[in-house]
Design a protein with these regions (language model features):
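Conserved beta-alpha-beta core of the PfkB/ribokinase-like small-molecule kinase fold
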Residues: 41-124, 130, 139-142, 147
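Conserved beta-strand segments that form the floor/walls of ligand-binding pockets within enzyme
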Residues: 24-26, 43, 72, 103, ...
């Protein structure tokens, strides 16, 4: 450790018999100053957006950075920290409206919108602003929607033994973001325009990479 370093947030994960995790959090964070001229893509998510005082700082940073960079977001609901859906939904939807890419799990959607289907939520979210929205569905794979292509894309799963699900959503997001970056569909304002005009043939390889 370092005597001079700031405290960082810690998540303690406890696994059940199926490998699903329950978390306890020890939170402490602030957003460092970022030079927007050196950023082409910014990703954020979960409690970083919804928990204060850092949450407001994150939203302010997203608003600044998106003037020249693409933005991705994973709401990654944590009810034990976030409280009720009503307490965080307006902030989550605010950030969704600033994004190019949004990914959430079916569990996230069920918590945030208990009376809506996955398709209804994805269509609602594209109306807020993002070009590509994706819902991961565990053993059922993923469902995706492009804002200007009203046909849902179903991406099948890969059958593998599951030891635990810790980091599964983050791994999916990392694969998808890196896949879109590698083909120029994320990473700066020109990439934003390319993503907006992309069809499924351009986007699908990144989704398979994420799976």
């Amino acid at each position: 450790g370092s005597d001079g370093a700031e405290r960082t947030s810690v998540a303690h994960a406890t696994l059940d018999a199926q490998g699903k995790a329950r978390y306890q959090f020890d939170l402490s964070y602030s957003v460092p100053r970022i030079d927007p001229t050196v950023v082409d893509h910014l990703h954020t998510g979960s409690i970083a957006v919804t928990v204060e005082p850092g949450g407001s700082q994150v939203v302010s940073t997203v608003r600044q950075i998106r003037q020249r960079a693409t933005i991705s977001y994973d709401p990654n609901a944590r009810p034990t920290i976030m409280g009720s859906p009503a307490a965080v939904l307006s902030r989550i939807e605010e950030v969704i409206g600033l994004c190019d890419l949004v990914k959430a799990s079916d569990e996230d959607l069920a918590w945030l919108y208990p009376d809506a289907t996955v398709e209804e939520v994805l269509r609602y979210w594209t109306g807020l602003g993002p070009t590509l929205v994706v819902c991961t569905r565990g053993p059922a794979g993923a469902t995706a929607l492009l804002r200007d292509n009203r046909e849902l894309l179903q991406v099948g799963p890969i059958d593998v033994p599951v030891a635990d699900t810790v980091g599964a959503g983050d791994s999916f997001m990392a694969g998808m973001v890196s896949g879109l970056l590698s083909v120029g569909l994320l990473g700066g304002l020109e990439a934003r325009q390319r993503l907006r005009s992309a069809d499924w043939s351009a986007v699908q390889p990144a989704l398979h990479r994420a799976i």
